[in-house]
């Protein structure tokens, strides 16, 4: 099965910064990425080798 998630956050105003990270199951999406990244994981069984 193909599952896709898309997160959207409001644009920042001058001087503001994001101070939070997003997480879903064993996938952590941190706020330090400056480009689009494709994350793939079938989530079954848990394989820590896929973790960032």
Curated annotation (Swiss-Prot):
Q: Which PANTHER family match?
A: REELIN
What is this protein called in UniProt?
Reelin
Binding partners and assembly? Oligomer of disulfide-linked homodimers.
For this chain, the Swiss-Prot or TrEMBL PTM comment says: N-glycosylated and to a lesser extent also O-glycosylated.
The EC number(s) this enzyme carries: 3.4.21.-
Q: Which compartments does it reside in?
A: Secreted, Extracellular space, Extracellular matrix
Q: What is known of its domains?
A: The basic C-terminal region is essential for secretion.
Biological processes, Gene Ontology terms: cell adhesion; layer formation in cerebral cortex; neuron migration; proteolysis; reelin-mediated signaling pathway
Q: What family does the database annotate?
A: Belongs to the reelin family.
Q: Mainly localized where?
A: secreted
Q: Name one GO molecular function term.
A: metal ion binding
Q: Which organism is it from?
A: Bos taurus
Q: Mind telling me which InterPro entries this protein's record contains? A: Reelin
Keywords from the named record: Calcium, Cell adhesion, Developmental protein, Extracellular matrix, Hydrolase, Metal-binding, Protease, Secreted, Serine protease, Zinc
Q: What does this protein do?
A: Extracellular matrix serine protease secreted by pioneer neurons that plays a role in layering of neurons in the cerebral cortex and cerebellum by coordinating cell positioning during neurodevelopment. Regulates microtubule function in neurons and neuronal migration. Binding to the extracellular domains of lipoprotein receptors VLDLR and LRP8/APOER2 induces tyrosine phosphorylation of DAB1 and modulation of TAU phosphorylation. Affects migration of sympathetic preganglionic neurons in the spinal cord, where it seems to act as a barrier to neuronal migration.
Annotated Gene Ontology cellular components are: extracellular space
